[in-house]
């Protein structure tokens, strides 16, 4: 089976390696990935994508693509005469590309479809307090993340797990699902399942606007929001007119009666015994790890040691 693999970030690497380790019935003829990223230093070589690095180690030819609609790219895919296209965390492909695959093109998506269709399924699952996540393989179609499903694998979302940790686990689970999917296609045993669009939910791309913390939330929701965006891009707020990223927090058994009675303002800060607390809608959370604008990531006790505020009632806004 001739395979073209398409992917860019770390999430896609376990799947590529798993396919490369399969028996002789499966051959990855080409890996397609994004362009190298420029480094901060102009003298340094551009940074290859994680998938490109893995493909080089495996000795598989690599093609970097900027525009998936470019006719030269479409022609290249056609010349390889692929039986299957495997896509994991790549771009939205036009039909002219994925229809080249004789037996079909499928995508690995990090959610239990039809829930969390979109660019950031892992993040939004945690933000919304889901207790279960997983992966789905499905055949590509023009409408994004709506194709007929092939295989699903489910896993719990652990209470303290952040988005980066869950994504790493799903990448490994997904690699197994990709292998099983290829075997089903080879053996002609695929039984595609239609998605129920009435159950669909969205997982939109993360932005500056939708990653800012709204402190007028229950404390459980605040902690879910923070871990759902950790370690990247990170939930953020404003303190002393500067941006602060918050990476880790927990619900706190903390009370400050005077503050709660006089200034029950969500976002209010309290420092006690070098611990940093922030008021939510129904209690307090403890901030454990954060980063002030222009500074390195620090633990909360480091922040508390140098705590200064321009306001009488300090708040994260």
UniProtKB/Swiss-Prot annotation:
Source organism superkingdom: Bacteria
Record has Protein biosynthesis as a keyword: yes
Residue sites binding (6S)-5,6,7,8-tetrahydrofolate per the record: 111-114
Keyword entries, A-Z: Protein biosynthesis, Transferase
Cellular component terms (Gene Ontology): cytosol
One Pfam family recorded for the sequence: Formyl_trans_C
Gene3D superfamilies in the record: 3.40.50.12230
Reactions catalysed according to its record: L-methionyl-tRNA(fMet) + (6R)-10-formyltetrahydrofolate = N-formyl-L-methionyl-tRNA(fMet) + (6S)-5,6,7,8-tetrahydrofolate + H(+)
E.C. numbers: 2.1.2.9
Gene Ontology MF term list: methionyl-tRNA formyltransferase activity
Function field: Attaches a formyl group to the free amino group of methionyl-tRNA(fMet). The formyl group appears to play a dual role in the initiator identity of N-formylmethionyl-tRNA by promoting its recognition by IF2 and preventing the misappropriation of this tRNA by the elongation apparatus.
NCBIfam families to which the protein is assigned, alphabetical: fmt
Family of this protein: Belongs to the Fmt family.
Listed name of the protein: Methionyl-tRNA formyltransferase
Species of provenance: Prosthecochloris aestuarii (strain DSM 271 / SK 413)
């Amino acid at each position: 089976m001739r395979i073209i693999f398409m992917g860019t970030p770390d999430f896609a690497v376990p799947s590529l390696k798993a396919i490369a380790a399969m028996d002789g019935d499966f051959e990855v003829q080409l890996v397609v990935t994004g362009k190298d990223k420029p480094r901060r230093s102009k003298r340094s070589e551009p940074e290859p994508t994680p998938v490109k690095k893995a493909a080089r180690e495996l000795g598989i030819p690599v093609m970097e693509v900027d525009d998936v609609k470019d006719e030269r790219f479409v022609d290249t895919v056609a010349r390889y005469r692929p039986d299957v296209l495997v896509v994991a965390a790549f771009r939205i492909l036009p039909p002219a590309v994925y229809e080249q695959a004789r037996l079909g093109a499928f995508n690995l998506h990090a959610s239990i479809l039809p829930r969390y269709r979109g660019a950031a399924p892992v993040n939004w699952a945690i933000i919304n307090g889901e207790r279960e996540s997983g992966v789905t393989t499905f055949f590509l179609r023009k409408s994004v993340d709506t194709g007929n499903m092939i295989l699903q694998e489910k896993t719990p979302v652990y209470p303290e797990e952040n988005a980066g940790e869950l994504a790493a686990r799903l990448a490994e689970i997904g690699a197994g699902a990709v292998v099983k999917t290829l075997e089903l296609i080879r053996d002609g045993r695929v039984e595609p399942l239609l998605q129920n669009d009435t159950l669909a939910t969205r997982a939109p791309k993360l932005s500056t606007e939708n990653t800012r913390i709204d402190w007028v939330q229950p404390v459980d929701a605040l902690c879910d929001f923070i871990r759902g965006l950790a370690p990247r891009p990170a939930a953020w707020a404003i303190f002393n007119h500067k941006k602060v990223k918050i990476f880790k927090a927990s619900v706190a058994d903390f009370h400050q009666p005077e503050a709660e009675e006089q200034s029950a303002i969500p976002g209010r800060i309290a420092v006690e015994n070098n611990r940093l607390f922030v008021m939510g809608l129904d209690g307090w959370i403890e901030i454990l790890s954060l980063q002030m604008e222009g500074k390195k990531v620090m633990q909360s006790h480091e922040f508390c040691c140098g705590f200064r505020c321009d306001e009488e009632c300090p708040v994260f806004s």
